Amino acid sequence: MSKKYGGQISFDPPARLEKDQVVAKVVQLKGSALFMVVENNGQELLVEMPPKYRNKIWVRRNGFVIVDKSEFLEKDNKIDGTILYVVQSPLKNWKKQIYWPKEFADESLNQNDSEESSSSEEEYDSD
């Protein structure tokens, strides 16, 4: 008797996503374990972090997560899904996957470039 899969932090992407799993971008923290995320089509979802990982995984704004919507499809509920994966750097492994949305690939490239340039500026400013 196996337990239902909760969530995890992962540097390695899964080979494929199931039917009701989507890649989403974290837009806003709504509570201790609730996050507002946006799919690549612009649809906003309210998702929750599984209780097992609430104090162990840090989700940052403008980061990416894999959301499972299957559990909440038939329920009349405010919550639209559960976070399965928290995408961590390096993003290049994730962006190579066929399920990674093109809209997010462009955004994540720009985000990484700006982070690298700001960190290099800080190094020069400290002299």
From Swiss-Prot:
SUPFAM superfamilies reported for this sequence: Nucleic acid-binding proteins
Q: Which Gene Ontology cellular component annotation is one that this UniProt entry carries?
A: cytosol
Q: Name one GO molecular function term.
A: RNA binding
Protein location: Cytoplasm; Nucleus
Region entry Disordered, spans: 107-127
Q: Which InterPro entries would you find in this protein's record?
A: EIF1AD (IPR039294), NA-bd_OB-fold (IPR012340), RNA-binding_domain_S1_IF1 (IPR006196), TIF_eIF-1A (IPR001253)
Alphabetically sorted, this entry's keywords are: Cytoplasm, Nucleus, Phosphoprotein, RNA-binding
The Phosphotyrosine modification is found at 124
What positions are modified (Phosphoserine)? Answer: 126
GO-annotated biological processes: cytoplasmic translational initiation
Where is the S1-like domain positioned along the sequence?
10-86
Q: Which domain of life is it from?
A: Eukaryota
**Which spans does this entry mark as compositional bias, Acidic residues?**
113-127
Instruction: Offer one Pfam family short name for this entry.
Output: eIF-1a
According to its UniProt record, where is this protein mainly located? cytoplasm
Does this UniProt record's set of keywords contain RNA-binding? yes
Keyword Nucleus applies: yes
Family statement: Belongs to the EIF1AD family.
Protein name from the UniProt record: S1-like domain-containing protein C146.08c
- Organism lineage string: Eukaryota, Fungi, Dikarya, Ascomycota, Taphrinomycotina
